[in-house]
């Protein structure tokens, strides 16, 4: 399935309720890829924004009490008009406050995809799980966490890390592309959530092939950016990642993706 070319032909509108740290980078990343971002946070305009939209991204990176009801109202409106939701529970394991909100959110709203690192996804299904800020525990078994989260949360799950894990309809793939520099740029994971949202179809059930393609395209772009950055570091890499998202092609995905099905 060539979802990337379809994306660039149709310029899908992605409504982003995302955190304050990453709005600019997320918007520029989506524009570079070929999507159309709108950074909307007002429930008063939700129905107008979401009716023509292809997807909604909800990212709780800078969650506050004042924003809780707005997030819930916007997400419920997306459900009402049939706009698919990607949920990014940033640092959910770092505080009980975030765990409680995510539990309320997932009990109230239907989401198509939940994306996070292994520690974040574990915290959604295990209230005792802990995190240090947004950092993930590399010793966790991402595949087993993804399986359990998929079963309990009834959503596609994408776990990011050195290798990424994607599960949908009980099919599981491990994706081995990517760059270590992604972990050195604030907002790189948040941008991936928006990229995944831009690949979601509005008129059919999201397939695992679309989720695998979206995640792999992003990671292949990151590999290209790292090569071009040479040894210059994260600042150069961040700018080159936007260029790489603009330049990456479906042929790159076909020829360079490193994907393993997990039995």
From Swiss-Prot:
Record's protein name: Hydroxyethylthiazole kinase
Gene3D superfamilies, sorted: 3.40.1190.20
Functional pathway: Cofactor biosynthesis; thiamine diphosphate biosynthesis; 4-methyl-5-(2-phosphoethyl)-thiazole from 5-(2-hydroxyethyl)-4-methylthiazole: step 1/1
One example of a Gene Ontology biological process annotation: thiamine biosynthetic process
Record: residues binding ATP: 115, 160
Keyword field: ATP-binding, Kinase, Magnesium, Metal-binding, Nucleotide-binding, Thiamine biosynthesis, Transferase
Reactions catalysed: 5-(2-hydroxyethyl)-4-methylthiazole + ATP = 4-methyl-5-(2-phosphooxyethyl)-thiazole + ADP + H(+)
